[in-house]
Protein backbone atom coordinates (compact mmCIF):
# COMPACT_ATOMS: atom_id res chain seq x y z
CA UNK A 1 0.00 0.00 0.00
CA UNK A 2 2.80 2.43 0.86
CA UNK A 3 4.42 1.78 -2.53
CA UNK A 4 1.09 2.38 -4.27
CA UNK A 5 0.74 5.73 -2.52
CA UNK A 6 4.25 6.76 -3.56
CA UNK A 7 3.71 5.66 -7.17
CA UNK A 8 0.43 7.60 -7.38
CA UNK A 9 1.98 10.73 -5.89
CA UNK A 10 5.04 10.57 -8.14
CA UNK A 11 2.71 10.34 -11.12
CA UNK A 12 1.01 13.53 -9.90
CA UNK A 13 4.42 15.18 -9.52
CA UNK A 14 5.36 14.20 -13.07
CA UNK A 15 2.17 15.79 -14.39
CA UNK A 16 2.81 18.98 -12.41
CA UNK A 17 6.38 19.12 -13.66
CA UNK A 18 5.27 18.57 -17.26
CA UNK A 19 2.67 21.35 -16.93
CA UNK A 20 5.22 23.80 -15.49
CA UNK A 21 7.66 23.07 -18.32
CA UNK A 22 4.95 23.23 -21.00
CA UNK A 23 3.74 26.59 -19.64
CA UNK A 24 7.34 27.84 -19.73
CA UNK A 25 7.64 26.94 -23.41
CA UNK A 26 4.45 28.90 -24.12
CA UNK A 27 5.82 31.95 -22.29
CA UNK A 28 9.13 31.67 -24.12
CA UNK A 29 7.38 31.53 -27.51
CA UNK A 30 5.37 34.66 -26.69
CA UNK A 31 8.44 36.49 -25.41
CA UNK A 32 10.71 35.49 -28.29
CA UNK A 33 8.10 36.70 -30.78
CA UNK A 34 8.23 40.12 -29.13
CA UNK A 35 11.98 40.14 -28.51
CA UNK A 36 13.81 37.96 -31.08
CA UNK A 37 17.17 38.92 -29.58
CA UNK A 38 16.30 36.94 -26.43
CA UNK A 39 15.92 33.78 -28.49
CA UNK A 40 19.26 34.46 -30.19
CA UNK A 41 20.90 34.90 -26.78
CA UNK A 42 19.37 31.63 -25.55
CA UNK A 43 20.73 29.81 -28.60
CA UNK A 44 24.18 31.37 -28.17
CA UNK A 45 24.22 30.42 -24.47
CA UNK A 46 23.39 26.81 -25.33
CA UNK A 47 26.19 26.70 -27.92
CA UNK A 48 28.61 28.29 -25.47
CA UNK A 49 27.76 25.68 -22.83
CA UNK A 50 28.56 22.87 -25.28
CA UNK A 51 31.82 24.52 -26.34
CA UNK A 52 32.74 25.11 -22.71
CA UNK A 53 32.32 21.41 -21.95
CA UNK A 54 34.52 20.54 -24.93
CA UNK A 55 37.13 23.05 -23.79
CA UNK A 56 37.25 21.53 -20.31
CA UNK A 57 37.81 18.08 -21.80
CA UNK A 58 40.53 19.32 -24.16
CA UNK A 59 42.23 21.32 -21.39
CA UNK A 60 42.44 24.64 -23.21
CA UNK A 61 42.52 27.34 -20.48
CA UNK A 62 42.53 30.34 -22.85
CA UNK A 63 39.50 29.21 -24.84
CA UNK A 64 37.76 28.37 -21.54
CA UNK A 65 38.34 31.92 -20.26
CA UNK A 66 37.05 33.36 -23.53
CA UNK A 67 33.90 31.25 -23.35
CA UNK A 68 33.29 32.20 -19.72
CA UNK A 69 33.60 35.87 -20.63
CA UNK A 70 31.21 35.42 -23.57
CA UNK A 71 28.63 33.66 -21.39
CA UNK A 72 28.76 36.45 -18.80
CA UNK A 73 28.25 39.09 -21.50
CA UNK A 74 25.28 37.23 -22.97
CA UNK A 75 23.69 36.84 -19.53
CA UNK A 76 24.21 40.53 -18.85
CA UNK A 77 22.60 41.48 -22.17
CA UNK A 78 19.65 39.18 -21.47
CA UNK A 79 19.20 40.70 -18.01
CA UNK A 80 19.24 44.25 -19.42
CA UNK A 81 16.56 43.42 -22.01
CA UNK A 82 14.34 41.96 -19.30
CA UNK A 83 14.85 44.92 -16.94
CA UNK A 84 14.26 47.47 -19.71
CA UNK A 85 10.90 45.86 -20.54
CA UNK A 86 9.82 45.27 -16.91
CA UNK A 87 9.97 41.49 -17.28
CA UNK A 88 10.80 39.43 -14.21
CA UNK A 89 13.72 37.04 -14.65
CA UNK A 90 11.44 34.34 -13.20
CA UNK A 91 9.30 34.70 -16.32
CA UNK A 92 11.83 32.52 -18.13
CA UNK A 93 11.95 29.89 -15.38
CA UNK A 94 9.56 26.96 -14.82
CA UNK A 95 6.88 27.81 -12.27
CA UNK A 96 7.28 24.73 -10.09
CA UNK A 97 5.01 24.33 -7.06
CA UNK A 98 8.03 23.32 -4.98
CA UNK A 99 11.17 25.33 -5.67
CA UNK A 100 13.20 22.95 -3.52
CA UNK A 101 12.70 19.74 -5.51
CA UNK A 102 11.37 21.30 -8.74
CA UNK A 103 8.35 18.99 -8.53
CA UNK A 104 10.43 15.82 -8.66
CA UNK A 105 9.67 14.82 -5.06
CA UNK A 106 13.36 14.31 -4.29
CA UNK A 107 16.28 16.46 -3.20
CA UNK A 108 19.98 15.75 -2.89
CA UNK A 109 21.25 15.01 0.59
CA UNK A 110 24.78 15.73 1.80
CA UNK A 111 25.92 12.63 -0.06
CA UNK A 112 25.13 11.69 -3.64
CA UNK A 113 21.93 9.95 -2.54
CA UNK A 114 18.50 11.48 -3.08
CA UNK A 115 15.99 11.78 -0.25
CA UNK A 116 12.29 12.57 -0.13
CA UNK A 117 11.54 16.27 -0.33
CA UNK A 118 9.57 17.64 2.66
CA UNK A 119 6.73 18.48 0.26
CA UNK A 120 6.41 14.82 -0.80
CA UNK A 121 6.63 13.63 2.81
CA UNK A 122 3.71 15.93 3.66
CA UNK A 123 1.74 14.70 0.64
CA UNK A 124 2.23 11.10 1.78
CA UNK A 125 1.01 12.02 5.27
CA UNK A 126 -2.01 13.91 3.91
CA UNK A 127 -2.89 11.00 1.62
CA UNK A 128 -2.57 8.54 4.50
CA UNK A 129 -4.69 10.74 6.78
CA UNK A 130 -7.47 10.86 4.17
CA UNK A 131 -7.21 7.13 3.57
CA UNK A 132 -7.56 6.43 7.31
CA UNK A 133 -11.16 7.75 7.31
CA UNK A 134 -10.36 9.89 10.38
CA UNK A 135 -11.24 13.53 9.84
CA UNK A 136 -9.76 15.29 12.86
CA UNK A 137 -6.25 13.89 13.26
CA UNK A 138 -4.86 17.43 13.29
CA UNK A 139 -6.69 18.01 16.59
CA UNK A 140 -6.61 14.55 18.13
CA UNK A 141 -2.97 13.62 18.65
CA UNK A 142 -0.58 13.29 21.56
CA UNK A 143 0.60 16.88 21.11
CA UNK A 144 -2.94 17.98 22.05
CA UNK A 145 -3.23 15.49 24.91
CA UNK A 146 -4.13 17.28 28.16
CA UNK A 147 -4.32 15.05 31.24
CA UNK A 148 -5.51 17.98 33.37
CA UNK A 149 -9.05 17.67 31.99
CA UNK A 150 -9.25 14.37 33.89
CA UNK A 151 -10.03 14.49 37.59
CA UNK A 152 -7.17 13.85 40.01
CA UNK A 153 -9.57 12.69 42.75
CA UNK A 154 -9.32 9.07 43.86
CA UNK A 155 -12.87 7.77 44.41
CA UNK A 156 -12.82 3.99 44.95
CA UNK A 157 -16.43 3.99 46.14
CA UNK A 158 -17.47 5.52 42.79
CA UNK A 159 -15.20 3.74 40.33
CA UNK A 160 -14.16 0.66 42.32
CA UNK A 161 -10.47 1.40 41.70
CA UNK A 162 -7.78 3.05 43.84
CA UNK A 163 -6.36 5.50 41.29
CA UNK A 164 -7.70 8.75 39.89
CA UNK A 165 -9.00 9.16 36.31
CA UNK A 166 -5.92 11.29 35.61
CA UNK A 167 -3.51 8.62 36.84
CA UNK A 168 -5.41 6.08 34.79
CA UNK A 169 -5.32 8.02 31.50
CA UNK A 170 -1.60 8.75 31.92
CA UNK A 171 -0.93 5.04 32.44
CA UNK A 172 -3.02 4.22 29.36
CA UNK A 173 -1.12 6.82 27.34
CA UNK A 174 2.21 5.23 28.32
CA UNK A 175 0.94 1.79 27.32
CA UNK A 176 -0.28 3.15 23.99
CA UNK A 177 3.10 4.73 23.23
CA UNK A 178 4.67 1.36 24.04
CA UNK A 179 2.20 -0.24 21.60
CA UNK A 180 3.25 2.23 18.87
CA UNK A 181 6.96 1.68 19.46
CA UNK A 182 6.54 -2.10 19.33
CA UNK A 183 3.92 -2.28 16.60
CA UNK A 184 5.93 -4.77 14.54
CA UNK A 185 6.41 -7.08 17.52
CA UNK A 186 3.94 -9.99 17.18
CA UNK A 187 4.10 -10.55 20.94
CA UNK A 188 2.38 -7.21 21.55
CA UNK A 189 -1.38 -7.64 21.75
CA UNK A 190 -4.19 -5.66 20.17
CA UNK A 191 -6.04 -3.09 22.28
CA UNK A 192 -9.55 -3.01 23.72
CA UNK A 193 -10.70 0.33 25.16
CA UNK A 194 -13.75 -0.02 27.37
CA UNK A 195 -15.71 2.54 29.37
CA UNK A 196 -18.61 4.95 29.16
CA UNK A 197 -19.06 7.51 26.40
CA UNK A 198 -17.03 10.72 26.55
CA UNK A 199 -13.96 9.43 28.40
CA UNK A 200 -11.35 9.71 25.65
CA UNK A 201 -11.42 6.27 24.00
CA UNK A 202 -11.78 7.62 20.46
CA UNK A 203 -9.31 10.43 21.17
CA UNK A 204 -6.60 7.99 22.30
CA UNK A 205 -7.33 5.73 19.30
CA UNK A 206 -6.82 8.71 16.99
CA UNK A 207 -3.59 9.65 18.77
CA UNK A 208 -2.25 6.17 18.05
CA UNK A 209 -3.44 6.39 14.44
CA UNK A 210 -1.65 9.71 13.99
CA UNK A 211 1.69 8.38 15.21
CA UNK A 212 1.50 5.20 13.16
CA UNK A 213 0.64 7.12 9.98
CA UNK A 214 3.71 9.28 10.60
CA UNK A 215 5.67 6.02 10.86
CA UNK A 216 4.43 4.99 7.42
CA UNK A 217 1.72 2.58 8.56
CA UNK A 218 -1.71 2.28 6.94
CA UNK A 219 -4.60 2.97 9.28
CA UNK A 220 -8.33 2.56 8.72
CA UNK A 221 -11.07 3.73 11.11
CA UNK A 222 -14.75 2.87 11.08
CA UNK A 223 -17.59 2.54 13.56
CA UNK A 224 -18.78 -1.01 14.15
CA UNK A 225 -22.29 -0.45 12.69
CA UNK A 226 -21.00 1.04 9.42
CA UNK A 227 -18.14 -1.44 9.19
CA UNK A 228 -20.30 -4.55 9.47
CA UNK A 229 -23.08 -3.22 7.22
CA UNK A 230 -20.52 -2.29 4.57
CA UNK A 231 -18.75 -5.65 4.76
CA UNK A 232 -22.04 -7.52 4.30
CA UNK A 233 -23.07 -5.26 1.41
CA UNK A 234 -19.70 -5.94 -0.14
CA UNK A 235 -19.94 -9.69 0.25
CA UNK A 236 -23.46 -10.21 -1.07
CA UNK A 237 -23.72 -7.51 -3.73
CA UNK A 238 -23.45 -9.14 -7.17
CA UNK A 239 -22.84 -5.75 -8.78
CA UNK A 240 -20.22 -4.46 -6.37
CA UNK A 241 -17.73 -1.90 -7.58
CA UNK A 242 -13.95 -2.01 -7.39
CA UNK A 243 -14.08 0.50 -4.52
CA UNK A 244 -16.22 -1.96 -2.53
CA UNK A 245 -13.68 -4.71 -3.20
CA UNK A 246 -10.92 -2.37 -2.02
CA UNK A 247 -12.92 -1.59 1.14
CA UNK A 248 -13.05 -5.24 2.22
CA UNK A 249 -9.38 -5.74 1.33
CA UNK A 250 -8.50 -2.67 3.42
CA UNK A 251 -10.47 -3.93 6.42
CA UNK A 252 -8.60 -7.24 6.38
CA UNK A 253 -5.13 -6.02 5.42
CA UNK A 254 -4.61 -2.49 6.78
CA UNK A 255 -1.78 -2.32 9.32
CA UNK A 256 -4.06 -0.87 12.01
CA UNK A 257 -7.84 -1.25 12.01
CA UNK A 258 -9.79 0.86 14.50
CA UNK A 259 -13.32 -0.40 15.24
CA UNK A 260 -15.17 2.26 17.20
CA UNK A 261 -18.45 1.94 19.13
CA UNK A 262 -18.59 -1.85 19.21
CA UNK A 263 -21.91 -2.78 20.78
CA UNK A 264 -23.99 -0.07 19.09
CA UNK A 265 -24.68 -2.18 15.98
CA UNK A 266 -27.85 -4.26 15.49
CA UNK A 267 -26.55 -7.80 15.69
CA UNK A 268 -27.52 -10.81 13.60
CA UNK A 269 -25.81 -14.07 12.68
CA UNK A 270 -24.25 -12.65 9.51
CA UNK A 271 -22.70 -9.70 11.34
CA UNK A 272 -21.35 -11.98 14.06
CA UNK A 273 -19.82 -14.22 11.42
CA UNK A 274 -18.21 -11.30 9.59
CA UNK A 275 -16.88 -9.77 12.81
CA UNK A 276 -15.24 -13.06 13.71
CA UNK A 277 -13.73 -13.37 10.23
CA UNK A 278 -12.26 -9.87 10.44
CA UNK A 279 -10.81 -10.34 13.92
CA UNK A 280 -9.52 -13.84 13.25
CA UNK A 281 -7.95 -13.03 9.88
CA UNK A 282 -6.06 -10.14 11.41
CA UNK A 283 -5.07 -12.12 14.52
CA UNK A 284 -3.63 -15.01 12.54
CA UNK A 285 -1.67 -12.67 10.27
CA UNK A 286 -3.21 -14.37 7.23
CA UNK A 287 -2.17 -11.29 5.22
CA UNK A 288 1.51 -12.25 5.66
CA UNK A 289 2.32 -9.10 7.61
CA UNK A 290 1.72 -7.77 11.11
CA UNK A 291 -1.79 -6.35 11.51
CA UNK A 292 -3.16 -4.92 14.75
CA UNK A 293 -6.66 -3.90 15.80
CA UNK A 294 -8.03 -1.40 18.31
CA UNK A 295 -11.62 -1.82 19.50
CA UNK A 296 -13.42 0.78 21.58
CA UNK A 297 -16.70 -0.04 23.28
CA UNK A 298 -19.00 0.85 26.15
CA UNK A 299 -19.22 -2.86 26.97
CA UNK A 300 -17.00 -4.57 29.51
CA UNK A 301 -15.46 -7.93 28.71
CA UNK A 302 -18.25 -9.83 30.51
CA UNK A 303 -20.88 -8.11 28.36
CA UNK A 304 -18.86 -8.85 25.23
CA UNK A 305 -18.99 -12.57 26.08
CA UNK A 306 -22.71 -12.22 26.79
CA UNK A 307 -23.65 -10.26 23.64
CA UNK A 308 -21.31 -11.91 21.15
CA UNK A 309 -20.41 -15.48 20.31
CA UNK A 310 -18.05 -17.33 22.63
CA UNK A 311 -15.39 -17.48 19.92
CA UNK A 312 -15.43 -13.67 19.50
CA UNK A 313 -15.24 -13.08 23.24
CA UNK A 314 -12.39 -15.55 23.64
CA UNK A 315 -10.41 -13.96 20.81
CA UNK A 316 -10.72 -10.55 22.43
CA UNK A 317 -10.02 -11.80 25.96
CA UNK A 318 -7.00 -13.79 24.82
CA UNK A 319 -5.38 -11.48 22.30
CA UNK A 320 -6.28 -7.94 23.39
CA UNK A 321 -4.88 -5.85 26.21
CA UNK A 322 -7.92 -4.35 27.95
CA UNK A 323 -7.90 -0.76 29.24
CA UNK A 324 -10.73 0.62 31.33
CA UNK A 325 -11.57 4.33 30.94
CA UNK A 326 -13.44 5.95 33.80
CA UNK A 327 -14.29 9.40 35.14
CA UNK A 328 -16.71 12.22 34.33
CA UNK A 329 -17.98 12.71 30.78
CA UNK A 330 -15.39 15.03 29.21
CA UNK A 331 -17.85 16.38 26.66
CA UNK A 332 -19.63 18.29 29.41
CA UNK A 333 -16.43 19.26 31.21
CA UNK A 334 -14.98 20.87 28.04
CA UNK A 335 -18.06 23.06 27.73
Task: Please place each PLM-identified region on the residue numbering.
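Conserved alpha-helical scaffold flanking the Walker A/P-loop in AAA+ ATPase domains
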Residues: 177-183, 230, 234-257, 273-284, ...
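Short glycine-rich substrate-engagement loop in P-loop NTPases that contacts/grips substrate
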Residues: 154-172, 188, 213, 217-253
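Pre-Walker A (pre-P-loop) alpha-helix and adjacent loop at the N terminus of AAA/AAA+ ATPase modules
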Residues: 138-190
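Loop/turn-to-beta-strand initiation segments
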Residues: 189, 217-218, 253-256, 285-295
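Walker A/P-loop nucleotide-binding motif
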Residues: 188-204
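Interdomain "pre-motor" coupling segment immediately N-terminal to P-loop NTPase/helicase cores
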Residues: 83-140
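Short, charge/polar-rich alpha-helical segments
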Residues: 1-12, 16-42
Amino acid sequence: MANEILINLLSEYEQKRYKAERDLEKRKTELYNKFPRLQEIESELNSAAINKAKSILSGGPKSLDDLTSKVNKLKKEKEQILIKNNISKDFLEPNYECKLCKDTGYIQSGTSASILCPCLKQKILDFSYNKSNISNLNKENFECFNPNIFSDKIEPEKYNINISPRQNILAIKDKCIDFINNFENPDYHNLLFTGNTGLGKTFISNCIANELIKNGKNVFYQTAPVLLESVIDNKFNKYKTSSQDNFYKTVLETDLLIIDDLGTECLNSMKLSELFTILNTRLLNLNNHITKTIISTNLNINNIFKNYEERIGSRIAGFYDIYYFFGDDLRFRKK
